[in-house]
Design a protein with these regions (language model features):
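Terminal accessory/anchoring regions of large secretory-pathway or extracellular enzymes
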Residues: 1-165
């Protein structure tokens, strides 16, 4: 949803829901829906896990019912991060059709060693944002470690280890 902002002055909180100028064109006229949330918490935004709660609000979990037989154990996700403050922001098909692209970033402004887990049967390489210059990353039990600088964005290519994926 990401609307326009907020301000706090003299103990009064205000939320700007819509900015709709009429010049040069009637940009935002029409029907609008808003989702907003107040998250009281103690301590810093890190201690209050504000980014985590924001993701949960803007990307609610969807349950899809079905039947199937679990054949292999794993993390349940193609990729997931085990390190607080590292966020996997994007997962998409690679532009060249060779695997998937995951983008992750460090969101707390600190240097961090991240532990990332892959679903069994996949391998990973780090590439640039244009999805070129791949450098394969060694995994151990479907896990790998990488160091993020403050606010750094990293791009990973995830592909099958063999043709059966």
């Amino acid at each position: 949803d990401c609307k326009y902002g907020y301000d706090i002055h003299d103990g009064v909180m205000r939320l700007t829901l819509l900015r709709s100028p009429t010049f040069p064109n009637a940009a935002d006229k029409g029907y609008h829906e808003f989702t907003y949330s107040f998250l009281p918490h103690k301590g810093t935004y890190r201690e209050g896990q504000v980014q985590k709660h924001a993701y949960e609000l803007n990307n609610p979990l969807e349950v899809i019912w079905g039947r199937g037989e679990k054949k292999e154990t794993g993390c349940g996700s193609l990729i997931q991060c085990q390190t607080e403050g590292i966020f996997i922001e994007t997962l998409k098909l690679a532009e060249d059709g060779n695997g998937y692209i995951a983008r992750a970033y460090e969101g707390f402004g600190t240097r961090k060693k991240a532990e990332i887990v892959l679903m069994p049967g996949y391998k990973v390489s780090e590439c640039n944002m244009l999805e070129t210059d791949d450098t394969e990353i060694a995994t151990d039990k479907n896990r790998f470690f990488t160091v993020f600088k403050p606010f750094e964005i990293k791009t990973f290519r995830i592909t099958c280890k063999n043709i059966k994926c």
